[in-house]
Amino acid sequence: MTRANHASGTDRLAEVVEQRGWKEDAIVVNVQGDEPLMPVANIQRVAAMLNETAGADMATLMEPLDPADANQQSVVKVVASETGRALYFSRSAIPFRREGGVPALLFRHIGLYAYRAGFLSTFVGWPPAAAEQSESLEQLRALAHDAYIQIELAPEAVPAGIDTESDLAAVRALLGAEQ
């Protein structure tokens, strides 16, 4: 078990890596607990992305976001560069559309990360960033310290995550239907 007072799931994962004594170059994948239906192909892809991308400290995935969900704070949005480098994550609709309305192309961040074990040691040495605390998004600590987060479209759609009571009910219903 891990300590109960970690600032984030990434901090908790770093404790596990330290306890297990994993090598610095080991690739560690963290599937967020609120994404219980994560497709195996996505888990495999995020690990492969980190392995294939020179200089990347982390890798993660995104998927197109229904504009109707743009203003839901429980849905994390992401903006990425043309080369697949994550630029910012937010609970607000980003990028902002100056003309009003919802941006035409939005992406939802998927709660799945791959790290090199050595990077996790570096990450926990950084204090939480102001943006991380404001948005309650741990990946913003990495960006605040110029970490390179590689991101691409998920190979498979991610079924409903669990961010609200209604999400939990939907996942329970789905799992009950599969039994």
Feature locations, PLM:
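Short, high-confidence coil segments that cap the C-terminus of an alpha-helix
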Residues: 24-25, 53-56, 147
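Short beta-strand-to-turn element immediately C-terminal to the catalytic PLP-Schiff-base lysine
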Residues: 16-19, 79-81, 162-163
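A short acidic, often aromatic-flanked loop/helix-cap motif at beta-alpha or helix-coil junctions
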Residues: 5-10, 66-67, 157-160
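Conserved alpha/beta core of the MobA/IspD/sugar-nucleotide pyrophosphorylase nucleotidyltransferase superfamily
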Residues: 103-179
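Structural signal for conserved beta-strand scaffold positions within catalytic alpha/beta enzyme cores
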Residues: 1-3, 30, 60-61, 88, ...
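Short phosphate-binding loop-to-helix
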Residues: 1-31, 35-48
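Conserved core of the sugar-phosphate nucleotidyltransferase
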Residues: 38-129
